[in-house]
Amino acid sequence: MLYKPSFAWYIYSYSANECIFASSLACACIQFRSAEIFSVRRDTEGSEILIYFNCDYTEGCHPNILKRLCETNMMQTVGYGEDEICDLARAKIRKACGREDVDVHFLVGGTQTNATVIAAILRPHQGALSADTGHINVHETGAVEATGHKVLPLPSTPDGKITAEQVENAYLAHVNDASFEHMVQPKLVYISLPTENGGLYSKAELTALHDVCTRCGLYLFIDGARLGYGLTAPENDVALADLCALSDVFYIGGTKVGALFGEAVVITNPALKTDFRYHIKQRGGMLAKGRLLGIQFDELFTDDLYFKISEKAVRQAKRIAKACEDAGCAFFAPSPTNQQFPIFPDTALEKLAEKYKYSYWARVDETHSAVRLCTSWATTDENVDALCKDIASVMAE
């Protein structure tokens, strides 16, 4: 077996981030003491559990966010994202985008955000074009379909992208069919940046998609659950301002990029702004204690924290990619982001699985499989050092 989940008891003894509260009539003072955090984590057989490289949401949140949440814990604000902290966060996101005219809304998670945005845009007879590997097509339990809208998959490139030519061909195939009114009408194009396979759309590719969507009367929606890791990849030539200019709506992912939870939807097309908060509420995305989302994005967009922690994760992933390459591994798909997809002999994976969690990705042949090794804002040098060393070791055997 290549990937064996382990059931574990987790026993944590904390001597860090101790919150010492001294309250007064005016404020609460919080002091954080930094010390070593000890974790004893054992599986059912008593051995230490694994180091996680399977995804980018295994940790909590960046310490700046945790500190700010504690500092503001007893603050009283209005609810549902209409507080002053959410307003500050929106202002910082608008500044980062270089656009004061965009609407910014905070939701809780990625699947909820995708379903809410797509359902808000489409009429009942319309569907969303997506890569066949797209998150809405394969990893959202039919969430978009549950809103009454069909996902229309297109074959993707090895790194998970679709092209402007594919979109135009799908549109023309529909309008030129004599029975077009008997089929779901493509009206929205869904892509993610980065893609599920770690691919990046270049500015030229996004421009081509934007242009074909404009010609065909389609909306372009960009899923940015891992946007920070895409924007900070050295190979990237796209900025937030470009996303504003080339898409109708996109979102800035927080859950996978330093936040406890949260996604920031940026609506650039004025036609899509009306009544969007109704849709958020209807889909269960309007958090009563909305300031918790505002606090997180306010911190992430203070002093470029969002981009700094993303860039660090990409650097760590590059180290892992080099270790795999040096050990003789091929790759399932090229990825310049925090997700890497090396191909290992199954025997090597069995050895790595004794110490590390990874995501099984695809069977390559009878004796080789592709896996995903994923870094995050919280990935440590020590864990990357250990993984790189062990990759070299198992591949040398």
Predicted feature locations:
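Cysteine-centered motifs
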Residues: 19, 27-29
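Active-site phosphate-binding strand-loop segment of PLP-dependent enzymes
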Residues: 53, 162-224
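PLP-dependent aminotransferase-like
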Residues: 122-185
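Conserved C-terminal alpha-helix-loop-beta "cap" of PLP-dependent enzymes
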Residues: 124-125, 318-395
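Active-site C-terminal subdomain of aminotransferase-like
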Residues: 185, 192, 200, 233, ...
